[in-house]
């Protein structure tokens, strides 16, 4: 998460916060959604 945060501090900041608050499940679910919106970059990092 360190590398990702450094790359997308703006987008990841909000996403990471939500994931940590709700749980890992949210991160996984959100990841899929973000991947479609952002692109394969996010998926590759994960």
Curated annotation (Swiss-Prot):
InterPro entries in the cross-refs: LtuA
Domain of life from the UniProt record: Bacteria
A Pfam entry, by short name: LtuA
Protein name from the UniProt record: Late transcription unit A protein
Underlying gene: ltuA
């Amino acid at each position: 998460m360190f590398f990702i945060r450094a790359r997308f501090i703006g987008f990841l900041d909000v996403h990471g916060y939500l994931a940590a608050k709700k749980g890992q499940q949210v991160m996984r679910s959100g990841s899929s959604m973000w991947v479609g919106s952002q692109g394969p970059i996010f998926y590759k990092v994960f």
